[in-house]
């Protein structure tokens, strides 16, 4: 019996395709930072947003967010330390928004 081979997609390529879907993006970013201390969560969140922007196209995200492309790259690089205003603009550019909820407390 002949083995059937299926074509596989490299993990990052598949992830970049998934990150074009706003519903997936919300789950991806929320899951990435859930339960982390603030110091870690902020770096991971910015890295995640940068990956989403890359997947959706930095030029397109820059145009939709009203942020110059060069400024977008600078803000989302490692240790870029973007302002809340910049993050809000980028999230607008990738088609999602921030929301808040009451923190669950341990009993």
Predicted feature locations:
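Short alpha-helical DNA-recognition segment
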Residues: 54-74
């Amino acid at each position: 019996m002949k083995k059937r081979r299926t074509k596989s997609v490299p993990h990052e390529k598949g992830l970049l395709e998934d990150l074009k879907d706003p519903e997936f993006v919300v789950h991806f970013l929320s899951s990435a930072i859930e339960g982390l201390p603030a110091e870690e969560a902020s770096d991971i969140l910015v890295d995640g947003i940068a990956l989403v922007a890359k997947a959706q196209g930095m030029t397109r995200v820059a145009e939709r967010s009203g942020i110059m492309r060069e400024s977008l790259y600078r803000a989302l690089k490692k240790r870029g330390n973007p302002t809340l205003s910049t993050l809000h603009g980028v999230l607008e550019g990738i088609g999602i928004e921030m929301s808040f909820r009451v923190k669950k407390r341990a009993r």
